[in-house]
Amino acid sequence: MSDPKFSIIGSGSIGIGWAIVFARAGYKVKVFDVEESALRNFEIQVKNRLELLDENKLLDDSPKKIAARIETTLDLAEAVAGADYVQECGPENLELKRELFTKLAGLTNSDVILASSSSALRTSEFASGIASNARCLVVHPGNPPYLISVAEVVPADFTSNESVEVCKKLLIKVGIIPIQVNNEP
């Protein structure tokens, strides 16, 4: 995958962090949220954090160039269209994650990685009943991921080895060190 496309579901603090990671690495990112006000706040926060990173000489590109790689949308289907990797960053709500991963499975090709940033819920809890769940896993980042460039990669028993390897390669490509956890906590 020479030019992967990234999607982020949820525009809160973790979504902001992932967007900066992917865009800073030179890739286009689409960010979805259900509220327009949340997306406007997201854009302000990304701009502010990029400027702070730039002031501390932690960027290779200008904040403006990096921010230009990030697009926001209120349309979930538009957000994941053409994506190779989807990073879910929603609230720690089991029913919400189940519903969201079911939708994501229906909107994406079966080889698209569907990752959750969850720190409390297991992949087996929210993805066990969905189609093509072999591509689902938890990818829990250091916070903020643009400064603490490590992420736990936690597959479920049903997650394929191929999906885990593709995920780890994509993380390395964007400057994140993947630490694989072999058993869900």
What are these regions (language model features)?
Residues 31-64, 153-163, 178, 185:
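Rossmann-like dinucleotide-binding cores of NAD(P)H-dependent redox enzymes
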Residues 19-21, 43-44, 98-101, 126-128:
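Short amphipathic alpha-helical segments
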Residues 6, 31, 66-85, 166-176, ...:
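Amphipathic alpha-helical segments at domain termini/boundaries
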Residues 20-23, 80, 105, 127, ...:
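A structural alpha-helix within SAM-dependent methyltransferase catalytic domains
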Residues 113-184:
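Rossmann-fold dinucleotide-binding core
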Residues 22, 47-54, 87, 108, ...:
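Structural signal for hydrophobic packing residues in well-ordered secondary-structure cores
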Residues 37-41, 52-114, 121-122:
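Rossmann-like NAD(P)-binding element
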